[in-house]
C-alpha cells in the first residue's frame, strides 16, 4: 500500500520509536499526519513539518485512559476536518510494573477503547468506509520477560485483540495487524521497575542483550504499514522485519 496522500492518526507519535516512525511517515508524502499524544512537543512537530512541508502535521492532546466518549468527541473533530482517515496507529505504552493499573489502562484498555471509538466512523455496518488499524505490541507478547509480567501480559493481550479484529474484517471492513518491537534503545527501557522488585536491575540486564536502534525499528515499522497484511503479527527485532506464524492450540469452532 502506498502511503501517498493518506490520512494517518498516530497515537503516541512523539515518543522514542513513535517520533522516529513519524519522521519516516512524513517522508512518504502523506496528506495528513495527526498526532495524538499526552505531552505536547512543539519542537518535534516543527521538525516533522520541516522534513516534508507538503504533509499537514497536526497535534491534539490525548490521554488514552480517558472514557470512550471523550475519544469519540476528539475523533469527531478530526473526521470533520479530514473527512476521511485511512490508518490508525495505536502506539501508547508504558513499561513500569510498579504501576499495575496504569500499565493495563495505557497498554491495553486505552488501545481497545481508541479502536472501539474509531469503529463508530469506520464500521461498514454503520455505512462507514472501513479502515486500517496498526497496533504496537511487543515481542514480550510472544514470550514474556518474566520479571515484568504485567507489561508482558498487556502486550500479549494486544496481540490477541488485534488478531480478533483481523478476523472480524469481513464484518466491519476494518483490517488490523500488530508490529512487535524487540529490545529497542529508547527511554522506555533505560530505567523501569520489575513486578514486586523481583529483579531490581532488570533494565540494566535487559540492555546487556543485543538491541536495535529506534531508527531501525521505525524503518521496519513503516515497511509493515506499507505491506498492509491483515492479521499479520510482525516481529521487529535486531533491525529485521519478519512475520510470526502463530501456533493454534485450540479452536472455538464458531
Curated annotation (Swiss-Prot):
GO terms for biological process: alcohol metabolic process. Belongs to the short-chain dehydrogenases/reductases (SDR) family. It comes from Drosophila ambigua (Fruit fly). NAD(+) binds at residues 10-33. This is Alcohol dehydrogenase. It is an enzyme of class 1 (oxidoreductase). GO terms for cellular component: cytosol. The gene is Adh. Homodimer. Keywords: NAD, Oxidoreductase.
Amino acid at each position: 500500500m502506498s502511503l501517498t496522500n493518506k490520512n494517518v492518526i498516530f497515537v503516541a507519535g512523539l515518543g522514542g520509536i513513535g517520533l522516529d516512525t513519524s519522521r519516516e511517515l512524513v517522508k512518504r508524502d502523506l496528506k495528513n499526519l495527526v498526532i495524538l499524544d499526552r505531552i505536547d512537543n512543539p519542537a518535534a512537530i516543527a521538525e516533522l513539518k520541516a522534513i516534508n512541508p507538503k504533509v499537514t502535521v497536526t497535534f491534539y492532546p490525548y490521554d488514552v485512559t480517558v472514557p470512550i466518549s471523550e475519544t469519540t468527541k476528539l475523533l469527531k473533530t478530526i473526521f470533520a476536518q479530514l473527512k476521511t482517515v485511512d490508518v490508525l496507529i495505536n502506539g501508547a505504552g508504558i513499561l513500569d510494573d510498579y504501576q499495575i493499573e496504569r500499565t493495563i489502562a495505557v497498554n491495553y484498555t486505552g488501545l481497545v477503547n481508541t479502536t472501539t471509538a474509531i469503529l463508530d466512523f469506520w464500521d461498514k455496518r454503520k455505512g462507514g468506509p472501513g479502515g486500517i488499524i496498526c497496533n504496537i505490541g511487543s515481542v514480550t507478547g510472544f514470550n514474556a520477560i518474566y520479571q515484568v509480567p504485567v507489561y508482558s501480559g498487556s502486550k500479549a493481550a494486544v496481540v490477541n485483540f488485534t488478531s480478533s479484529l483481523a478476523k472480524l474484517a469481513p464484518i466491519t471492513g476494518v483490517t488490523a495487524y500488530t508490529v512487535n518491537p524487540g529490545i529497542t534503545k529508547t527511554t522506555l527501557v533505560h530505567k523501569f521497575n520489575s513486578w514486586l522488585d523481583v529483579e531490581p536491575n532488570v533494565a540494566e540486564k535487559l540492555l546487556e542483550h543485543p538491541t536495535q536502534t529506534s531508527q531501525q525499528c521505525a524503518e521496519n515499522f513503516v515497511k509493515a504499514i506499507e505491506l498492509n497484511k491483515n492479521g499479520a503479527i510482525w516481529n521487529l527485532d535486531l533491525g529485521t522485519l519478519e512475520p510470526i506464524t502463530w501456533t493454534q492450540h485450540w479452536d472455538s469452532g464458531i
